Amino acid sequence: MLNKTGNRLSAALLGYAILVILLLTLNPFYLAVPNRIGFTFRTDIRNVIFNIVLFIPFGFFYRLTLRRRGAFLLGAIISFIIETVQIFIPVRTPSIIDILTNTLGSGMGALAYDLVSTRITIPQSTVGRLRLETPLMGLIYLLVPLLWANALAFDAAPNRWILTLLISLCGTIVFSEIFKHWWETRSYRVSLNAALAAGIWFFIGSGPALTQPLPVLAIGLALMFLTATLTALPQQSKERRFERATLKRVFPIFGLYLLLLALWHPLRPLTAWHVTLGFTDRITEKSVQLLNPRIEYLVAFTVLGYLLAEWRGRSEIPLSQDLPRLFLFSSGVALAVEFLVGFQSGPGASLIRAVMVVVSALFGGTIYHLLRAHIRFLLGR
């Protein structure tokens, strides 16, 4: 039976994965009585790829955290609920094929974990680290839903590749540092393992964008090469706890990504400052594409909250004391960004968006504290 810290962490991670799936599959969140109730068998290759890839991390997370069977069945149940709700969303088309591919993806994710943990000959300590016993691994897992959301927006606007690249650079830095400290000796095999891990991570997260393979493949291959190169370089520090030094390199890149994401497209014409209450006032077919970048923005603030909490991890601040600080800092960032967005042509600043991203940041910080509590339990501290 899992300990309390493991149960809490599992619930938070699985809840986060399910929440992101719901955000991506149920937007624009507008319900209406349908003219016809039923499911279709129609689909296309893009939807097949997206639906499989979307549920792979869910199945992986399920086995990773709960270590129980049933990911296949649970994926089918969640997918059926989603497709049933889509009957009442005018711009959505519920499909039996979607249920089957979601279920397949969930099973593949669970199988991937089983293969890594039981079939591949790696030290048990490495499998332990894969199970989030290294705080930076939590960041790697949280970046996967961010890549999902980015990939959906990328598909509608290919010129957003720079945002995909910035997320990838964050992953590159984290993977290279983790592998450097997992293996003290430098060898081509360690660099190769780091590159393969980074590549698998990127292509799982960017699966929905594989319908435009050239830019995605280019970024993925560049990511793998850079990860291998950075892993082969000598360690800059011999400290056992290397998270803070790694975060110093991640923060500038992630900060630039967050700013560009909020202002995208940054070259839009300027106008008088203006603000709106909600996200959008249009519920049309195009609204799905308009909302995808906004969902990416919410997910990005969850990652920001995790980064901020991990930055102060050494101080051992309890969650109750850290939440007010997270609230103040994330509120300051959110309001500063909305102030800048208000001068751009278009919807302008959004009060609802500012509130929602602060909540997202608090959730990200909470995940870090749950993870840290679980690590302390595993270490007997």
Range-by-range predicted roles:
Residues 1-97, 103-381:
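Bulky hydrophobic segments
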